[in-house]
Amino acid sequence: MKHITLALCLFAAPLAAQAPFWENEWPNTDFSNTSVAFTEILSGGPGRDGIPALDDPAYEPAADAALVATEPVMVVELNGQARAFPIRYLMWHEIANTEVGGVPVAVTFCPLCNAGLVFDRRLDGQVLDFGVTGKLRFSGLVMYDRQTESWWQQFTGQGIVGDMNGARLDVLVSWMSSWQDFVAEFPNGEVLARPDVARNYGTNPYGGYDSAARPFLYTGEMPPFDIPPLARVIQVGKRAWLLDRLQRSTEIVEDGVRITWESGMNSPLDTARIAQGRDIGAIRVYDAQSGAPLVHDVVFAFAFHAFVPDGRWMLGD
């Protein structure tokens, strides 16, 4: 991880930038309308759109894609259409503005907090398109919409600066899967095609990050109960279950939620090549009574604590 740490340190602002400075880069953003402290926002290195979001990307049949069986993909299924979004691509783009089942969605992945969320882009009668600000808050991706140039916290789906301050995007059900499991479940599914952008796809620029002692560019409190900050947790609303706990039992049924775990999926934030990352397994989350899939995410513990400070830690007995 030394190479990426050095590179990011060279670009990251040592102190939190203030709104007057940002106004030069963002002249159309209303910085007087905010719900967060500007001191919480740092530069992550690349500037506005330095990490380019994907717009209306191409897809290919799952049967035609040459991906490693155990590499991770984000899965979205809407109105009978299933699409997979390989982390090998989202690692370098973080946002894909697209449609699934006729629904305009933003498929998002924040490497530094391991948050993968899918949002409905429709809000107040318009369809929003999202880009990457290049800013981080509590090490979490800050997005912006191109229609109003408001800033959004990816972890919460909430507008935090500008005309959309306080607005909230609808989060849609998605999950992280191994490529082989996606193909088995959706043999007629589609997968995001390799973008026509010069990036080292398949590699992880944050080598060793998920075994680091501390998160990068994080200024908030550490998790309680001596939980390692980069431990993965399954977040369902304001509740968090430790992945380590789930791996020991492979299934947890608790508080109205059923969570399952199965081995066979690589960590995208371990080794330099994603397909060689250690096996962290894949999880699914359901309503314990109806069996319906639930909105959830698998995130780092520090990020859950930062963005859900009143959250419940489901530690078991």
Write out the residue ranges for each language-model feature:
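N-terminal signal peptide c-region/cleavage motif recognized by signal peptidases
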Residues: A12-P14
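Mid-to-C-terminal functional-domain signal that highlights helix-capping/loop sites
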Residues: A17-D317
